Amino acid sequence: MANAPKVFIDGEAGTTGLQIRERLVGRTDLQLISIDPDKRKDADARAEMLNSADAVILCLPDDAAKEAVSLVSNPNTVIIDASTAYRTAEGWAYGFAELDSEQRGKIAASKRISNPGCYPTGAIALTRPLVSAGILPAELPVSYNAVSGYTGGGKAMIAQFEDESAADHTRAPYFIYGLSLSHKHVPEMQKHGGLLTRPIFTPAVGRYAQGMIVEMPLHLSTLNGAPSLADIHAALVKHYKGEAFVEVASLDEAKALTTLDPEGLNGTNRLKLFVFGSDAGGQARLVALLDNLGKGASGAAVQNLNIALGLDEAAGL
């Protein structure tokens, strides 16, 4: 334990930070260090913690994350940023290890790792394998429809649903948002999905805490070679073969389902993909199921931490 790498979570009191801490507490292969709560806003104290750690996980808003990065002068400190600030930035490894065969190595070799967004994790997981396989044309306009538990919106949205004194408190069971089609996750989806055309993203929130479904509907006739559902399924299976945290449901399992529960993978770092649709109708409905606070946030951060520090990738997961 004495020689175990030191890990500092900057923003450990937030929703994602708390879940990361829960996954790391008690591990003997690393040392979790914390700042005095009274000094969380003290730049000098934070800088000392950031530079004394072997790895830091930033669970902060974008601007605060950028400030934290600017405080790191130790060239050996690994930074894993959970904000959107660096997800499309040069010099940062994108922290979706299953993106392609080279991504895990890029994460392991990098000192700057950007943790993926929850919605993009599902969208990219469905899209990138099909683009790489030549099935989905990179220039094809695609749409992503998604629903998340309200924790996906951070403290503000949690208060909106749970705090009756909040100015924007709602009793709605479900609502759509991102109506201007300018959600901040779209550039990330496009870049790491391998798309040349900006996708349409239509998110929604339900009155439940966590759990997420991301969908990509497709007309088979718009794809290269007019593939069948089995062809699409085979491409996904091939891409994720051997991956511990990404599962592609069998076509038989998908066919037997009549509904899908967005809370189905809560508390895990798993991501499950489904191929629904109709060959006769020439349409596919691809679906990703995940915990927005698991594989969509804290779980992915711990997975990236393990990779970056050369530890067991599944530790704490």
Swiss-Prot record:
Keywords: Amino-acid biosynthesis, Arginine biosynthesis, Cytoplasm, NADP, Oxidoreductase. The keyword Zinc does not apply. SUPFAM superfamilies: Glyceraldehyde-3-phosphate dehydrogenase-like, C-terminal domain (SSF55347), NAD(P)-binding Rossmann-fold domains (SSF51735). GO terms for biological process: L-arginine biosynthetic process. It catalyses: N-acetyl-L-glutamate 5-semialdehyde + phosphate + NADP(+) = N-acetyl-L-glutamyl 5-phosphate + NADPH + H(+). The active site is at 118. GO terms for cellular component: cytoplasm. Catalyzes the NADPH-dependent reduction of N-acetyl-5-glutamyl phosphate to yield N-acetyl-L-glutamate 5-semialdehyde. Belongs to the NAGSA dehydrogenase family. Type 2 subfamily. This is N-acetyl-gamma-glutamyl-phosphate reductase. The lineage of its organism: Bacteria, Pseudomonadati, Pseudomonadota, Alphaproteobacteria, Caulobacterales. The gene is argC.
